[in-house]
Regions:
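Non-catalytic C-terminal accessory region of glycerolipid acyltransferases
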Residues: 1-202
Length: 202
């Protein structure tokens, strides 16, 4: 079965508002003799190694994806938290930039020890891309990734069917008393469960 498996080797999000996570990541890299990264966290190799090793007979390549957001640097030049979906839809973040690099499977070391070095080198490349994106002294080079770019806009043709489906589903629920009760319960219990999950998950 054709599929994609997405892995975030850092294990958690890079959040400038939680400096302890960034500091812990950098001290781990220093302790292990690895390059200290500024705009990304130090990757851990285990899950990546297990995934690639298990799927190697079905893979021909791995895609290294780096994402950056415009409008997320404050007046002091410090990175802010990545925008939420609401902030993005309200145009507080004008564009999302995605840099994709295709790596042939044959170019990825099989042994975990060597794959660890390879993975960290990939994150060093990501870090350089993001330093250029966020911190470039030349303003013309800021908010851009190098190389040829393709601009992609969400067309009405792609978004309208989802809007009509979800809008129709919500409207049909709100037309009946039992539907309204279910709608309210979904909001209340969904929010409570979500808050509980966020507070107890490691």
């Amino acid at each position: 079965t054709q599929m994609y498996l997405v892995i975030f080797p850092e294990g958690t999000r890079y959040n400038p508002e939680i400096p302890k996570v960034i500091a812990d990541s950098q001290s781990f890299a220093e302790k292990e003799g690895l390059a200290i990264l500024k705009h990304v966290l130090t990757p851990r190799v285990k899950a990546t190694h297990v995934a690639i090793d298990t799927m190697k007979d079905y893979l021909d390549a791995v895609y290294d994806v780096t994402v950056a957001y415009e409008g997320t640097v404050d007046h002091k030049g410090q990175r802010k938290l990545a925008p939420s979906m609401t902030e993005f839809l309200c145009k507080e973040c004008p564009r999302v930039h995605i840099f994709i690099d295709r790596i042939e499977l044959k170019d990825i070391p099989e042994e975990q020890m060597y794959m660890r070095r390879w993975l960290h080198e990939r994150f060093e490349i990501k870090d350089k891309l993001l330093i250029e994106f966020y911190d470039a002294k030349d303003s013309k080079r800021r908010n851009k990734f190098p190389g040829k770019s393709v601009h992609s806009k969400l067309s009405l043709k792609k978004t309208l069917p989802s809007l009509l489906f979800l809008g129709g589903l919500t409207a049909s629920m709100l037309l009946t008393e039992s539907g309204r009760k279910l709608y309210v319960k979904t909001w209340i219990y969904g929010t409570l469960i979500g808050c509980l999950w966020v507070s107890i998950k490691p």
